[in-house]
Amino acid sequence: MYRKITCLISLLLAGNCLFAQTTERWSLKECIDYSLEHNIQLKQERISLEESEINVKSSRASLFPSLSFSTSQNGRYQPYFDDGGNSFITSDGSGGSRVSSSKEHFSYSGSYGINAGMTLYNGGKKINDIKQKKLLRNIAELSVKERENTLKEEIAKIFVQILYSQEAIEVNKATLATAQESLNQGQEKYKVGKIARSEVVQLESQVKNAEYNLVNSEAQYAQFKLQLKQLLELEGSDEILIEQPATTEQLALSTLATVDEAYTTALALRPEIASTRLTSESSELAVKIAKAGYSPTLSLNAGAGTSNNDNSNNSFGEQLKYNLNASVGVTLSIPLYDNRTTKSNIQKAKLQQSSNALQEISARKELYSTIENLWFDAHSAQKKFIAAKSNVESAQASYELVSEQFNVGLKNATELLTERTNLLVAQQELLQSKYTAILNAQLLKFYMSGDILF
């Protein structure tokens, strides 16, 4: 029996080890790479990019001549047909006569033609349309990069929140363990009459509070993991664990570039800035395209055709040969009055041009504001982190001293709980400042490099 129980325990432990080995831990890079491959919104942006590529090809093709072939085949039926023979004379009832035929007739004819046409001049509308389509293609490509950057930023924020929650859980576990230990000691003292029942109740309350904090931090951890899985397009039942960076303290205290340095670098790198610039260029072309409505249009057209019918004595091939004809011509269309359509289009295009210029200025200001806030938050968090480290050390030493004094009866439960609360607050402030510094410092680097890895 003992051997069976031992074997069963060994199997259970082996199963747990196998599960632990097969549960993959995701690094930040792996999360980002997976999201860039599977995110649905990003896939939609890539589809839009492919559509813009097709629009460029279609616009280029409009410069070439159009070519078409046409044919028509016609049949004609005549139930009473006079072919000059096979007729007879009948009276018309008035003393006269007429010739009637008893023969029906069916005739057939066909025509064939090839036509070509192309626009020779239309005020540069087609050329500018090609340029605009290329710009729109580039804007669509930048939209893909914008979405990629947004995903990277969102994943990094949640990743850091998970790291924070993991450490918060460990802090709350340690707090619960010390609170439980103090309660056990207090109960022993109460049994021998060293402390009052009210102090035991206080210690019990502290344990319950520590349990609540632990449950709350675990719930936050689960919520952040769920958000990460949703960003990665993972099923809700799939388990995900993240890889803890080796040097979080070093990341928190990494050197910060100045605001101006970061802004100058980001200005040349960020896709949203390039996108607004290209949008302004596209609006300039839109004005030129609208103005082309005032220009004349010159078109060239040419065609060749032939025909046949069954009434001819010539063969089918001879008919096609002798009926062959060709034509060529040019068409000039000069706009005189178009119900203000062109003028309205020009005015609308200019208004859109002004709006896009303002949008470009706004994007630059927004970028500067974002970088300024990231730098300020990172710098402030670094200073808080350095101060919080000293505060935790002091709070830890004070708590240990009061705990020893409580054990020998020199301090009461209220004083012990106060010191433990101070230590917990200091530890939480340390965690918060550390991960706030990590997030903002790394995001600042991300705006300067396009990569966010730690």
Walk through the language-model features, giving the residues of each.
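Small/polar, glycine/serine/threonine/aspartate-rich low-complexity segments that form flexible
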Residues: 22-23, 70-118, 245-255, 288, ...
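Acidic, low-complexity, intrinsically disordered peripheral segments
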Residues: 77, 236, 429-454
